[in-house]
Amino acid sequence: MYDKRSAFFLAGAAPNKGNTTRLSDIEVAVMTELPTSRSVLSDTLWAIKGQGVQAETLHLETLVRKPRTIKPSGAHTIIGGFAQLARFFPPGRDVLARIEDKLILELVPNLVPGRAIIFEDQYISTGGQLYEVLVGHDRFVGDLRSRLYPYLQTKGIVPGHVCHPYDACTFLIGQEAGCIITDCFGEAFDAPLDVLTDVGFLLFANQHIYQEVWPRLKRLISEEGF
């Protein structure tokens, strides 16, 4: 993370089903914050399937541990909060930004000059993106790269870096916290538990956000041709 902000150690454990093992088979997941050199606090979050989420904050100097409350946002809209599509790597950032802007204009057709309508946080860490939703900072994060890049390849554009299953191995924590997580086609999130498969995801803080964003986002993606 270039010492700009926290990175995350991610781990998920699943029964070994050989080549058929999938992310949905993960039964235990843990993520530990690796803070910057200027920070003395580190959060660890973990979940066991069907048993909810637990978390604690460790003070790295005193070694004191305190319970950490995990509570995704209960907001009914992304307006006024943090919500974004991941576009920290080229190519296709123009396409993703265009989709975002169209989505916002549909939600707020009568923009007030000078008003901050929505915020974005391009956190270059899938673990960091999940964390920000889990603690209530972000309301929606989407990663459409695995869906967008094959489309761009048909136009002769070289694809960029994408998310992989090991980046998403702690999504069980989000599910246990009550978040809505789908793949980038709006289907149940899942993928082979390997290191090569390209994956995408849509991470909604709650059902209200899902109902507001997904139907519109689905149509806007289709209008862009991918």
Label the model's feature ranges.
Residues 19-27, 31-226:
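An extended, acidic
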